[in-house]
């Protein structure tokens, strides 16, 4: 004779099991919403994701194809990514022992949050401190890893409020401070004096300067590590034309890198990604830099065009995108652009001073011209 439980419909048993398993979730994870990019139909020009447009030179693609053609697909990747680290070292000056590589900088952020997670001073949970607005993954990843996110508003010029930030560091004793410079979404680089004062405020805090967009700015600040050993630098290849490879890295004190590397999943970077990224760095870097220089030139032109529109204000940019204040709420401008087949990033849902802000990626000349023409119609 079958038991009552065996007579229950399978769907019912699955539902009960799912409810029981949901009880195992940490509350902060249950409260999160998965990141889903906005992808409305009819879009012909995507200027929302800070991706570089296709290269004007075939050399980058050709170098990648050559490198990938020699991959032994039946073998696991090099777990230490030796050749890629050496290529990064030659391009940046970083010691290979100071490099921690990940699947984009997102994985490196996750590794940092996993490793540097011991609560301080009898606190119930570790703390991550960031400015706001900034890269959303800091907050999302922090919550997912059980850290308490603390956010300090940027000042009226989208620069660091040093006094408020130092006070927050003193009061909350964070494990990690994330500082994107150039910042996403505002596009500007923080004033060097302010940034240095913040990262030097507490030597027991690990400060991460995220230089994802530094190729579009006036050079890295990585030399600071010589005097500030508790500062690390994040970099990525995603913003300079090879986002598909998903290669990022941290440069930090080798002793810390050695500890964090213990929890990095083996073979995290595929052989294809390693070979392709190495080829870009070794064989096509001059072409990449020409593409970056061309984007910077187009950025200057786009700033002039948009700033000339009545009521539009453009924050000076050190990245491959613009932070644009609209004459009124950003939502109607965003919707009108979508109706024209142009997708940008709107922050109207964030409210407050962000409700009038758009983030617009620098596109090709043709894409930028179409954007400006659309904005002119909207501004009438």
Where on the chain are the PLM-derived regions?
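Conserved PLP-binding catalytic core of the aspartate aminotransferase-like
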Residues: 154, 295-296, 306-340
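N-terminal "arm"/small-domain region of PLP-dependent enzymes with the aminotransferase-like
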Residues: 2-75, 86, 90, 173
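PLP-dependent aminotransferase class I/II
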Residues: 57, 230-308, 313-314
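Conserved PLP cofactor-binding pocket of PLP-dependent enzymes
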Residues: 27-29, 34, 316-317, 324, ...
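Conserved core of the PLP fold type I
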Residues: 9, 72-204, 213-228, 232
């Amino acid at each position: 004779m079958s038991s009552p439980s065996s007579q229950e419909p399978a769907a019912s048993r699955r539902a009960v099991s799912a409810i029981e398993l949901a009880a195992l979730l940490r509350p902060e994870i249950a409260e999160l919403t998965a990141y889903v990019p906005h992808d409305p139909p009819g879009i012909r020009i995507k200027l929302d994701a800070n991706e570089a447009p296709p290269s004007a030179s075939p050399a980058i693609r050709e170098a990648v194809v050559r490198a990938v053609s020699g991959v032994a697909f039946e073998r696991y990747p090099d777990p230490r990514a030796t050749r890629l680290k050496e290529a990064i070292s030659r391009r940046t000056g970083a010691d290979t022992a100071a490099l921690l590589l990940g699947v984009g900088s997102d994985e490196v952020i996750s590794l940092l949050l996993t490793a540097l997670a011991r609560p301080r001073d009898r606190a119930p949970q570790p703390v991550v401190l960031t400015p706001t607005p900034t890269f959303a993954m800091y907050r999302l990843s922090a919550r997912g890893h059980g850290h308490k996110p603390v956010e300090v508003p940027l000042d009226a010029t989208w620069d660091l409020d040093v006094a408020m930030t130092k006070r927050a560091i003193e009061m909350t004793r964070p494990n990690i401070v994330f500082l994107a410079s150039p910042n996403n979404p505002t596009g500007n680089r923080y004033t060097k004096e302010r940034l240095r004062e913040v990262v030097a405020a507490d030597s027991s805090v690990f400060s991460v300067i995220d230089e994802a967009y530094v190729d579009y700015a006036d050079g890295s600040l990585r030399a600071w590590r010589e005097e500030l050993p508790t500062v690390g630098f994040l970099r990525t290849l995603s913003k300079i034309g090879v986002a598909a490879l998903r290669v990022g890295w941290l440069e930090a004190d080798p002793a810390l890198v050695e500890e964090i590397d213990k929890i990095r999943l083996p073979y995290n970077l595929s052989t294809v990604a390693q070979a392709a990224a190495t080829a870009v760095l070794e064989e096509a870097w001059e072409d990449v830099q020409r593409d970056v220089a061309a984007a910077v030139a187009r950025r200057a032109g786009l700033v002039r065009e948009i700033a000339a529109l009545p009521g539009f204000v453009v924050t000076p940019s050190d990245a491959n995108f613009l932070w644009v204040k609209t004459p009124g709420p950003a939502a109607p401008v965003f919707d009108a652009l979508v109706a024209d087949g142009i997708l940008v990033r709107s922050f109207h849902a964030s409210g407050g001073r962000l409700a009038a802000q758009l983030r617009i990626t620098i596109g090709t000349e043709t894409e930028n011209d179409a954007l400006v023409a659309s904005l002119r119609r909207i501004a009438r």
